[in-house]
């Protein structure tokens, strides 16, 4: 967690410093903007049935920006997010999976997630945005054959909360956010509570 938190804090510091530059007319955004993004999803599931470790996957999505004032805006989003239940805290295993043909197959989950974010502009420009809001996810596909169960292991619906920061350039954007699950996603008969957490790092274009 400390490894993931440090880059986010450094990014926030750099973005805030960037936002303190002299105001430029090009910083003024139009009321309506459309965006597309993709990036890395680092997630874990908390519960006695899971190790307190992370795994990596990906997320793809699109959003609409409604810039109501110079400081406040709304950003509805729809994202396709993939997660897996094989987890590791050894970064060398992640490198092996990325570059040397390793795999994660124990429990793959595909979600379609809908978020409603409040954008709060930081500093004199509209470049740096603090993002906060709720999210609802629908489980589209579940592959958990290693658990030897014929029933649904994970619940179909999940509610979560998001918080993060985004740097909005004229055409491109990048950012990071933290997601915490608010509901129990355990769909089995045992009483163990499962809640998800994730760090997301993304880049994209804004039209």
Positions of PLM-derived features:
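Cleavable N-terminal export/targeting peptides
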Residues: 1-29
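Outer-membrane beta-barrel translocator domains and adjoining extracellular loop/strand segments
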Residues: 46-51, 86-93, 142-149, 186-191
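Short glycine/proline- and aromatic-enriched beta-strand/turn motifs that initiate or cap beta-hairpins
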Residues: 20-61, 181
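A charged, solvent-exposed segment within the mature domains of Sec-exported extracytoplasmic proteins
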Residues: 127-129, 138-175
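Hydrophobic, lipid-facing positions within transmembrane beta-strands of outer-membrane proteins
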Residues: 34, 56-62, 112-116, 128, ...
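Gram-negative (and chloroplast) outer-membrane scaffold detector with strong preference
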Residues: 22-24, 28, 32, 40-42, ...
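Predominantly the C-terminal beta-signal and adjacent terminal strand-loop region
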Residues: 77, 81-88, 156, 160-207
